[in-house]
């Protein structure tokens, strides 16, 4: 990593269907090998499935799912005098969103439904109802931070 210049943030354009920047970021995370049209099909298909199952706006379900998965606190390793401590720190908003998206997709990929569209829609529905692997991951991270609360004075 360069010490001189920090990389400037790129502007992400909103997606064509919902006009939402977060959906675009989600699509980009689903994408493999630059195949954006495939990722687009998967994400829009999953949102259509959600709309068919719940009769609610798919965007509200998606936003609720992401909100339920995003962590507020995490642990980071800090080396102090030969010992490594897991120090709980608050998570920046950009990292919260990135982790939430990453965990949702990882949880969806680990499911047993037949197609990725079905897996993604099922995981989003579960997450919006505070269930599923992605929510469990968030709970585990929060538990870890709570368990290491004694080391919070090592924050930097």
Swiss-Prot record:
GO terms for cellular component: small ribosomal subunit. Keywords: Ribonucleoprotein, Ribosomal protein, RNA-binding, rRNA-binding, tRNA-binding. The keyword Phosphoprotein does not apply. GO terms for biological process: translation. PROSITE patterns: RIBOSOMAL_S7. One of its GO terms (molecular function) is tRNA binding. CDD domains: uS7_Bacteria. Pfam families: Ribosomal_S7 (PF00177). Part of the 30S ribosomal subunit. Contacts proteins S9 and S11. Belongs to the universal ribosomal protein uS7 family. NCBIfam families: rpsG_bact. HAMAP family: Ribosomal_uS7_B (MF_00480_B). One of the primary rRNA binding proteins, it binds directly to 16S rRNA where it nucleates assembly of the head domain of the 30S subunit. Is located at the subunit interface close to the decoding center, probably blocks exit of the E-site tRNA. PANTHER family: RIBOSOMAL PROTEIN S7. This is Small ribosomal subunit protein uS7. The gene is rpsG.
């Amino acid at each position: 990593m360069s010490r001189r210049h920090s990389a400037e943030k790129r502007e992400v354009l909103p997606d064509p269907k919902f006009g939402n920047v977060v959906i675009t970021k989600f699509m980009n995370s689903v994408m493999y090998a630059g195949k954006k049209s495939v990722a687009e099909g998967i994400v829009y298909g999953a949102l259509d499935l959600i709309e068919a199952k719940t009769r609610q706006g798919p965007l509200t379900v998606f936003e609720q799912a992401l909100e339920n998965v995003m962590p507020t606190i995490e642990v980071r390793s800090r080396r102090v005098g030969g010992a490594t401590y897991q120090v709980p720190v608050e998570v920046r908003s950009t990292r919260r969103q990135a982790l939430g998206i990453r965990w949702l997709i990882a949880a969806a990929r680990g499911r047993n439904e037949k197609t990725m569209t079905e897996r993604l829609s099922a995981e989003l529905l579960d997450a919006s109802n505070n269930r599923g692997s992605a929510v469990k991951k968030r709970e585990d991270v929060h538990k870890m931070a709570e368990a290491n609360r004694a080391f919070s004075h090592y924050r930097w």
